[in-house]
Amino acid sequence: MEEHKPDILSCLPLELLLYIISFLPFESARLTPLVSTRFRSVWNQAILVAHSHNGSIEDISHAVSRFINNFDEHDPSKNTRKLELHVDKSTFVSTILAPHNVMHMSFFFSGGSKKEESFCWRLEIDDQIPRRVDSSGFLVKTLCLDSVNSLTHEVVSSMVLEFSLLDSLKICRCKRLTSLTIDSPTKLLHLSISGCPKLRYLEIISFKLKTFHYQGSLPLIKIHEHFNLTKAVFDVTQGPSYYNNALDIGPLSLTIKNSQSLTLCRWMFEEVIKPSISSSWRSFQFYKLQELRWIDNSMNQEQINSLISFLKLCPSIERLFITIDSNTYSSNEEVSVNADHARVVLRDLEVVKLEGFKSEEDKNQLIFALQEIVSIDQPLLVLSSIS
């Protein structure tokens, strides 16, 4: 039987192994456990600082700040990328420093923790331009917050004010969050919110916002001033969460008017967008829209009419993706193709992708309707999968 050659790397001193890892890009360094058996334990030491901390929730801010400020990618003793905190024997906080200035912060709560309550959250981002940027420490530009609750949202807010270069924010799984205000007039460029089922009110003060991703029930949204999104995702298959039929959604329609990429549910077009632009139907168009992702619960003739009605507002559309999800909320509004746009021809539409269609008949009806509004000289590539 052939003898295995000795694992040379495993024989190296710990300090030298840590030194080697410190010069590797994060995505490469995380694969080192596959290289050597000893690297498995070395990798854990290189990225993880575990704290058994029995202080208060307010102490989280100080611990995380020290962790961030002490980070040095090229110093083996300071190249730790994960911090774990145990607070009050019931709260667990995980902070990960990822490549490209991304910080993930997740909260976990045991069954014995204090009862979570519904909460309103105002999150301010310091818009002052720093006079000088300290080259030491970890510079947070993208912050991902997971499962913030009524007990921790204030300490998170105080931490965010310290991130002077923050321009991207992701908030997810805040299950008791009912009202959220994002206040960043000049800094924030990217905002993503998902998995917040109780959210009823969203206020955005961010004049420079370029991308917005929202997943969940559509809340009442208040827009301050005007900003132009280049990409907007409204994955609101669960329908609306507001109860005000007089919702003023006009400012929201204006923010997505110049989007290049848009994800939309049919019901949102029928109940929200179309009523808000009814007075300017002849002139309102999504001039810059190149990619549309359309979500519906089925595709009968009325729903095809609704889609065609929207497409006629998009003269520059190039790519169309249609997803049928039977669990999607359905609007009861009646929509007909507007006569003012009856002669519109889509000259740039090249690709149509269909997903979730249950029958060939539905698919063929839609393709026929699309051919009616596509330029006769324009080849159309249709990709489809039957559910």
Swiss-Prot record:
Residue ranges the record marks as coiled coil: none
A Pfam family annotated for this UniProt entry: F-box
Gene3D superfamilies, alphabetized: 1.20.1280.50, Ribonuclease Inhibitor
Leader peptide range in chain numbering: none
The F-box domain, residue ranges: 6-52
Name this protein carries in UniProt: F-box protein At2g39490
Provenance organism: Arabidopsis thaliana (Mouse-ear cress)
